[in-house]
A protein has these predicted regions:
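Short beta-strand edge/turn micro-motifs at domain boundaries
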Residues: 40-41, 48-132
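A solvent-exposed, acidic/Ser-Thr-rich amphipathic alpha-helical stretch
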Residues: 1-75
Length: 132
């Protein structure tokens, strides 16, 4: 967030977000995001990091394409979200711009015959949040 590298995982991220919500007097406030726009592009159409063998593209050019691979499930995506952020519960709270960039990659656990219930199809590989 704003250039800080978080290597400690989800717990470090939660601690940082909680600290952002604190007022100088120590009261935790609500944070309100108003998305004004977003844009998504394919970053890598053939993302294969940790891809199971059965989903890799067959080397035989005459082989019938697998239903799961022809839908570009192997692509990684770049998602950019912009908008306004306000710290405080009411609509009168001061606002500032934000920009959030995500790299989304396929969740290979969802590309099996019986995937886990409520599993997400995409996972966040990288996130870069900037409050401007």
């Amino acid at each position: 967030v704003n250039g800080a590298v978080l290597a400690g995982g989800p717990d470090e991220y939660e601690t940082m977000v909680k600290a952002q919500r604190q007022t100088p007097s120590g009261i935790e406030t609500k944070v309100r995001y108003e998305v004004e726009g977003w844009d998504v592009h394919v970053l890598n159409p053939d993302f294969t990091l940790a891809c199971p063998e059965n989903l890799l593209t067959p080397t035989d050019p005459d082989a019938k394409p697998d239903r799961r691979t022809k839908d570009n499930i192997k692509a990684s995506l770049l998602l950019q979200v912009t908008g306004m952020i306000s710290y405080g519960g009411d609509k009168e709270a001061p606002k500032s711009m934000f920009n959030d960039v995500f790299v989304l990659v396929p969740n290979w656990d969802t590309h099996v015959k019986n995937p886990p219930r409520h599993a997400r199809r995409w996972l966040v590989m990288s996130q870069n949040f900037r409050a401007l």
